[in-house]
From Swiss-Prot:
SUPFAM superfamilies: P-loop containing nucleoside triphosphate hydrolases. This is Nucleoside-triphosphatase THEP1. Its EC number is 3.6.1.15. One of its GO terms (molecular function) is ATP binding.
Amino acid sequence: MDKPFRIYITGKPGIGKTTLLFNIYRILKEKNWRITGFYCPEVRVNNTRMGFKIKSVLSGKEAWLARVDARSGIRIGKYYVVLEDNFVRQLEEEIFSFPDIILIDEIGPMELSSVSLKNLINKILTSNYPVIAVVHRSIKFDDGVIYEVTIQNRDILLEEILGRVTSNKNNI
């Protein structure tokens, strides 16, 4: 049996990893791919980062992942991880609803500090579904193709990754 299709996108903060993943999402969506997964946008109030949400790619449902003003939960930097297990269970149902591909933004220390989210990420990465994930630069995987986004290559990676994804769709 072939190994599951995996692409990991990594690089320095602010280099364009999320932008690249959202462009991949947009183009695959236009081609009628069924896309599931999650992403973790920052939440700002008056230009101050207050925390991060976690949002479903499929439904747009969201919950708090981490907040600066919480006082319980695992602390990562100035944020406290407050993700509720119930939301992760709902997210899991959506993610495994027969997708063509699963997108994750991102797999990092904050996401992995939630036991329920870490378990979901492990379940995704051990599934047979194809996955494209943005990965924190401190985390390494050896079961797929790794793209490091740089200023020099960030404009050409979109076509390269899309070519790899679409050429593999028949094998997915």
